[in-house]
Amino acid sequence: MTTIVSVRRNGQVVIGGDGQATLGNTVMKGNVKKVRRLYNDKVIAGFAGGTADAFTLFELFERKLEMHQGHLVKAAVELAKDWRTDRMLRKLEALLAVADENASLIITGNGDVIQPENDLIAIGSGGPYAQAAARALLENTDIGARDIVEKALGIAGDICIYTNHNLTIEELSSKA
């Protein structure tokens, strides 16, 4: 698995992820880029789960963004509908964390589109560790979104054997 974290604070939204890819209990690659920019750099997205599955979902999600002129929520709902109802897509095993200047969402293969409390997203095998760390930092410090993401991923990388310290981090200005 992996760890993906998204934090929104003080006019910034940041998504970061580690770079480890495993096959069973063997590390196959340590520098996978699991976070990327989509739709003319107006959306950032990260994935946890199967790499090939996630790349397929990124492509489909970008098409949905194009169809809906970059409207994140509409594109996410349409992707989730297709993911849940299409026989081939249903077999894809991944979670997506996506954000634009207005919203942060989790998209699942069960057809769920979730806007989490406090715009804090943490998915993947190290998600619970990263979420706890990020939440503590959000509630008890004034540090910026990028620093929170970096620290949360660092803690997850120290604890979760499926998460490393090779990070990819993307950020956008936020209205929320």
UniProtKB/Swiss-Prot annotation:
Its GO CC terms?
Answer: HslUV protease complex; proteasome core complex
Per its Swiss-Prot or TrEMBL record, what regulates the activity? Allosterically activated by HslU binding.
Reaction(s) this enzyme catalyzes, per UniProt: ATP-dependent cleavage of peptide bonds with broad specificity
Q: Which Gene3D superfamilies match?
A: Glutamine Phosphoribosylpyrophosphate, subunit 1, domain 1
One example GO MF annotation: threonine-type endopeptidase activity
Instruction: Print the keywords alphabetically.
Output: Allosteric enzyme, Cytoplasm, Hydrolase, Metal-binding, Protease, Sodium, Threonine protease
Q: Which cysteines are joined by disulfide bonds?
A: none
Subcellular location(s): the record lists: Cytoplasm
Q: Does the keyword Membrane apply?
A: no
User: What does the record give as EC number?
Assistant: 3.4.25.2
Under the heading Pfam families, the entry gives: Proteasome
Q: Name the InterPro entries for this protein.
A: ATP-dep_Prtase_HsIV_su, Ntn_hydrolases_N, Proteasome_sua/b, Proteasome_suB-type
Q: Which residues form the active site?
A: T2
| Gene Ontology annotations of biological process type | proteolysis involved in protein catabolic process
Tell me, in one coarse class, where this protein mainly resides.
cytoplasm
* Source domain of life: Bacteria
Check the record and name the HAMAP family matching this protein: HslV
Function noted in UniProt: Protease subunit of a proteasome-like degradation complex believed to be a general protein degrading machinery.
* Known partners and oligomeric status: A double ring-shaped homohexamer of HslV is capped on each side by a ring-shaped HslU homohexamer. The assembly of the HslU/HslV complex is dependent on binding of ATP.
- Record-stated family: Belongs to the peptidase T1B family. HslV subfamily.
Return the protein name.
Answer: ATP-dependent protease subunit HslV
Q: What is the lineage of its organism?
A: Bacteria, Pseudomonadati, Pseudomonadota, Gammaproteobacteria, Enterobacterales
Gene symbol here is: hslV
